[in-house]
């Protein structure tokens, strides 16, 4: 048998090296993703806890207020970061953060109306919307795997939502709207990263969204908080930052094909949280729909990884 072609050999070595690197950093990815999964769960429970005393605008104001304070503290500790905060592409920042705030509002509100596992399962439709939006806005082509991922995603959504049946709840549309908004936010983030650093994107996200939250808040809303609510306020503030921090470091430590399967553990974990803390039933339709959505995402990820 003849020797493999140079192109095939290079591709084989590239894939082999990626597998070795992925295995080498698997422990680190697992550690960061554990932090991210715990942060997402704490965020969901904290929003539900605060919703007993505050409206969604006020909850988001706490989250973004904590973010602004933490990022300003970093600027004080590292003065060289100030240069990165120079206003640049502010119209795109404004578009991104307006859509992101609306998405956060819809997501947080859905947490107070639906079982936690249902919200988290439908949130995984975001990659479907990203694939659709990437064609007109980023010029990316539609591949067979992306098309298959989109079709499987919509089938999974139909299994979870079950339109036309008695189990259908309008609040389910809130989660789908939030997932679509997060996809728009991700597309605009990719456009921003061409000229704007990550720290600046995070800073302007919190700085712009804080007044949006305050606009719908009672000026004295913090006085509504009783001692029983304080752990939830701290949870929203910390989890809002730690979730993004851990997720970013997980993707930095390993390939998406390694990180994303860990992220899928969000659904059984949050289902367990909902069952333990709120007595929420484990809905087989939610798990079946989530499995279909996830299979489409995994198919596309594997195809993209092999073709890279």
Q: Where on the chain are the PLM-derived regions?
A:
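Transmembrane alpha-helical segments that form core, pore/gating elements
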Residues: 45-48, 56-57, 71, 166-225, ...
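Transmembrane alpha-helices of multi-pass small-molecule transport proteins
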Residues: 54-102, 181-184, 204-220
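C-terminal transmembrane-helix exit sites in multi-pass transporters
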Residues: 109, 126-148, 268-287
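Helix-helix packing/entry segments at the starts of transmembrane helices
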Residues: 119-125, 192-207, 244-275
């Amino acid at each position: 048998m003849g020797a493999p072609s140079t192109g095939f050999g290079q591709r084989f070595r590239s894939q082999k090296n990626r597998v070795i690197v992925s295995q080498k950093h698997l422990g680190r990815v697992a550690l960061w993703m554990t932090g991210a999964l715990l942060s997402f769960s704490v965020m969901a429970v904290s929003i539900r806890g605060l919703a007993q005393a505050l409206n969604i605008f006020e909850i988001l104001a706490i989250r973004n207020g904590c973010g602004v304070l933490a990022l300003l503290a970093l600027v004080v500790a590292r003065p060289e970061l100030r240069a990165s905060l120079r206003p640049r592409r502010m119209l795109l920042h404004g578009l991104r953060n307006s859509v992101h705030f609306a998405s956060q509002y819809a997501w947080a509100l859905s947490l107070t109306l639906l079982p936690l596992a249902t919200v988290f399962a439908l949130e995984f439709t975001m990659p479907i919307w990203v694939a659709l939006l990437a064609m007109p806005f980023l010029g990316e082509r539609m591949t067979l795997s992306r098309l298959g991922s989109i079709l499987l995603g919509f089938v999974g959504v139909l299994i979870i939502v079950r339109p036309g049946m008695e189990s259908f709840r309008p609040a389910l549309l809130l989660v789908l709207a939030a997932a679509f908004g997060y996809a728009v936010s991700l597309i605009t983030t990719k456009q921003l990263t061409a000229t704007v650093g990550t720290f600046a994107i995070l800073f302007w996200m919190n700085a712009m969204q804080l007044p949006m939250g305050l606009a719908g808040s009672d000026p004295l809303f913090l006085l509504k908080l009783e001692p029983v609510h304080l752990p939830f306020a701290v949870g929203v503030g910390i989890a809002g930052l730690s979730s993004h921090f851990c997720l970013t470091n997980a993707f930095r430590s390993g390939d998406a094909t390694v990180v994303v399967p860990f992220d899928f553990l969000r659904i059984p974990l949050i289902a367990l949280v909902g069952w333990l803390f709120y007595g929420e039933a484990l809905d087989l339709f939610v798990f079946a729909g989530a499995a279909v959505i996830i299979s489409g995402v995994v198919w596309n990820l594997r195809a993209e990884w092999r073709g890279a």
